[in-house]
Swiss-Prot record:
Catalyzes the ATP-dependent transfer of a sulfur to tRNA to produce 4-thiouridine in position 8 of tRNAs, which functions as a near-UV photosensor. Also catalyzes the transfer of sulfur to the sulfur carrier protein ThiS, forming ThiS-thiocarboxylate. This is a step in the synthesis of thiazole, in the thiamine biosynthesis pathway. The sulfur is donated as persulfide by IscS. HAMAP family: ThiI. InterPro entries: Rossmann-like_a/b/a_fold, ThiI_AANH, ThiI_fer, ThiI_N, THUMP_dom, THUMP_ThiI, tRNA_STrfase, tRNA_sulfurtransferase_ThiI. One of its GO terms (molecular function) is CCA tRNA nucleotidyltransferase activity. Pathway: Cofactor biosynthesis; thiamine diphosphate biosynthesis. It holds the Pfam family ThiI_fer. This is Probable tRNA sulfurtransferase. It comes from the Bacteria. It catalyses: [ThiI sulfur-carrier protein]-S-sulfanyl-L-cysteine + a uridine in tRNA + 2 reduced [2Fe-2S]-[ferredoxin] + ATP + H(+) = [ThiI sulfur-carrier protein]-L-cysteine + a 4-thiouridine in tRNA + 2 oxidized [2Fe-2S]-[ferredoxin] + AMP + diphosphate; [ThiS sulfur-carrier protein]-C-terminal Gly-Gly-AMP + S-sulfanyl-L-cysteinyl-[cysteine desulfurase] + AH2 = [ThiS sulfur-carrier protein]-C-terminal-Gly-aminoethanethioate + L-cysteinyl-[cysteine desulfurase] + A + AMP + 2 H(+). Keywords: ATP-binding, Cytoplasm, Nucleotide-binding, RNA-binding, Thiamine biosynthesis, Transferase, tRNA-binding. ATP binds at L184, L185, H209, F210, R266, G288, Q297.
Length: 404
């Protein structure tokens, strides 16, 4: 019986790019190669319009499972390759149709003749291929408007591709084409989703997490490491910077009026993150803020917090409600990690009545009474940095190291 030999990848949004399209295609190819590292027999050919993945005996389901998380892929089809002869095409179409899983009652045939010298025209091929499927199946009908399955045939010189198992990719742009940002990763539900959506726009991310021992636990720190690890499903790696924040928070609690302590804390986080961004050649800062969700996420608060950085602040969740954010968190695998009951530094010294309309002038006046610069310098200098990769890649590297 014929088996799937290829996966044909369609780019989606990348097709709108002009002269720099080759850069996008090259980056996507590199990302796919990295994602499929554990499949040594695979061959990848990336053209201007699509990507061809030759399986060479590798399990198509296992490969598909990893492909679906690669940004830059709009859709992909499992494909069979047959000689460009009518009988081979008919048998290939039937074999592909029979491998489709689920309750299938209707189908249609779509033919694209890239090879214009093929002796039959498209309108002649449609009844030939469709009739062959009808003759060899039961309780199946043709529906050209809303079929359960679309059997696609691409005829080329010498060979043809047969496809009907179409799967959705992650969409967006390949990670790496849009520069790098620093993501404030708190450990809650929102910030991992913000990181995910930032990566979807082709941007590489490094994460910054503020922890305040002994007020925050090692389990809270591990939760953030696990979140960063989960995000590596969608990129090559995530660099995580763990910033000690205890002394900064204790000083804020002592020196700043409680109503402004949350605002000043966020401003200090921005200052520290900007310093790390400069070190790491990042171009922006991403946060998980959603407008009006909590006191520190009003327009007034954001206006006051933004004052302390010259970097663009990207807020992918700004117009989403909590249920929308939770839905994405569940889909990308971060929700169950985020709801582990371990407190982060944002819950330490929480004021009873935080200002919802803080003013820049007041924040500056309160901060001017104490020199926070040495504390910021110390926090940046004492940060712990770790590089996280997908579990499969780490296992392969460890296996390689054991050989020596």
């Amino acid at each position: 019986m014929l088996k799937y030999e290829y996966i044909l990848v369609r780019y989606g949004e990348m097709t709108t790019k002009g002269k720099n399209r080759s850069k996008f295609v090259s980056t996507l190819k590199d990302n796919v190669k990295f994602k499929l590292k554990k499949f040594p027999n695979i061959k990848i050919d990336a053209t201007h319009d699509r990507m061809y993945i030759q399986l060479n005996g590798e399990d198509h389901e296992a490969v598909s499972e990893r492909l679906k998380d690669v940004f830059g892929i709009h859709k992909f089809n499992l494909a069979m390759k047959v000689p460009s002869e009518l009988e081979d095409i008919k048998e290939g179409a039937l074999a592909a149709f029979l491998q489709v899983k689920g309750d299938v009652k209707t189908f249609k045939i779509t033919v694209h003749r890239s090879y214009k010298r093929f002796p039959m025209r498209t309108m002649e091929l449609l009844p030939e291929i469709g009739g062959h499927i009808l003759e060899n199946t039961e309780d199946i009908t043709v529906d050209v408007h809303n079929p359960d399955v679309n059997v696609r045939v691409e005829i080329r010189s010498g060979y043809s591709y047969i496809m009907c198992d179409e799967r959705m990719g992650a969409g967006g742009l390949p990670v790496g084409v849009g520069g790098k940002v620093m993501v404030l990763l708190s450990g809650g539900i929102d910030s991992p989703v913000a990181a995910y959506l930032t990566m979807k726009r082709g941007v590489s991310v490094e994460a910054v997490h503020f922890h305040s021992p002994p007020f925050t636990s090692e389990r809270a720190k591990q939760k953030v490491i696990d979140l960063a690890q989960e995000l590596t499903k969608y990129c090559k790696r995530v660099t995580l910077h763990l910033v000690p924040f205890t002394e900064v928070q204790k000083t804020i609690n002592k020196e700043i009026p409680s109503s402004y302590s949350m605002t000043v804390m966020r401003r200090m986080m921005m200052r520290i993150t900007e310093r790390i961004a400069e070190e790491r050649n990042a171009l922006a800062i991403t946060t998980g803020e959603s407008l009006g969700q909590v006191a520190s996420q009003t327009l007034d608060s954001m206006h006051t917090i933004n004052e302390v950085t010259n970097y663009p602040v990207i807020r992918p969740l700004i117009t989403m409600d909590k249920l929308e954010i939770i839905k994405i968190a569940e889909e990308i695998g971060t929700y169950d990690i985020s709801i582990r009951p371990y407190e982060d530094c944002c819950t330490v010294f929480t004021p009873a009545s935080p200002a919802t309309k803080p003013k820049r002038e007041k924040a500056n006046r309160f901060e001017a009474k104490y020199d926070f610069t040495p504390l910021i310098d110390e926090a940046v200098a004492n940060k712990e940095t770790m590089v996280l990769q997908t579990v499969e890649v780490v296992a392969e590297e460890e296996k390689f190291e054991e050989l020596f």
